[in-house]
Design a protein with these regions (language model features):
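Metal/cofactor-centered catalytic core regions of large enzymes
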Residues: 1-3, 8-255
Length: 255
């Protein structure tokens, strides 16, 4: 689906820039419903097979259980969020605690485990995929018709096809991308529940079209800080499993 929206090269690089001020960059491609329906048929069965294969596998359990333990208190101390926090016994999920973008209209559970080890962090991710499939199915059935972006010309650039037809549209496009739009003076912090935890953005506006200050709170940067605690009194051979269980995005960590 992302390939149809933004092209295969951009999709692979995860730099599709699809979400824009006032909406999204483009409408969903033709046939997207059928593509999602096919995915919803394939993934649950395959995922269940993988889960059954690993859940009672003595080698898998022996390598991951009681390894890299992280307590709830340690998660709080280091700002660990997302599946890693929920694998340590705390049910914090922004989709439930601070609902946004209509997520409160979807039915899903927040899996919680108490062991706090590598096995629990793996297991939480599997359980959350099952819940995500429920959300996707509900979104497919509830998807409304209508515009995919606001029509306020101060925020939204003109359709690209008009750039070859209208000088006014070309000027409008140029001003939007060179000057931007003015934001009222003030500050705000908004966070969402990303696959790895709390992903937030703090922004300060001085009333101009350029932010006075902006900071992105990425989950991987915070989660990986707990690695020394996770690895305390553990052999170096456990490091690979411990890091993988946190599932960090290195681009978020390397600042």
């Amino acid at each position: 689906i992302l390939d149809g929206l933004v092209g295969s090269e951009m999709c692979i690089r995860d730099s599709h820039n699809y979400i824009r001020p006032g909406g999204v960059a483009a409408d969903l491609p033709d046939g997207w419903q059928k593509d999602i329906e096919e995915i919803l048929k394939i993934i649950p069965e395959k995922l269940q097979d993988y889960d059954d294969m690993l859940l009672d596998n003595p080698i898998w359990k022996g390598r991951l259980q009681n390894v890299g333990i992280l307590t709830t208190e340690e998660c709080f101390a280091y700002g660990v969020t997302g599946p890693s926090l929920r694998a340590s016994g705390h049910s914090w999920d922004l989709r439930k605690a601070q609902p946004y973008s209509g997520i409160e209209n979807f039915e899903f559970e927040v899996p919680v485990l108490n062991e706090g080890d590598v096995f629990a962090r793996w297991r939480i991710k599997v359980l959350e995929i099952f819940e995500s499939l429920k959300i996707v199915e509900q979104a497919l059935n509830k998807m409304p018709k209508g515009p995919y972006k606001v029509q306020d010309k101060k925020i939204t650039p003109p359709p690209r096809k008009r750039l070859d037809e209208s000088m006014e549209a070309l000027i409008h496009h140029f001003k939007i991308y060179t000057e931007g739009f003015k934001v009222p003076e003030g500050d705000a912090y908004v966070a969402i529940e990303s696959p790895r935890g709390e992903l937030g953005c703090y922004i300060v506006s001085d009333g101009s079209s350029k932010p006075y200050r902006m900071h992105v709170r990425g989950p991987s940067f915070c989660n990986l800080q707990a690695l020394p605690v996770i690895m305390a009194d553990s052999p170096i051979a456990d490091a690979v499993a411990a890091i993988a269980s946190l599932d960090p995005v290195i681009g978020d960590v390397d600042r």
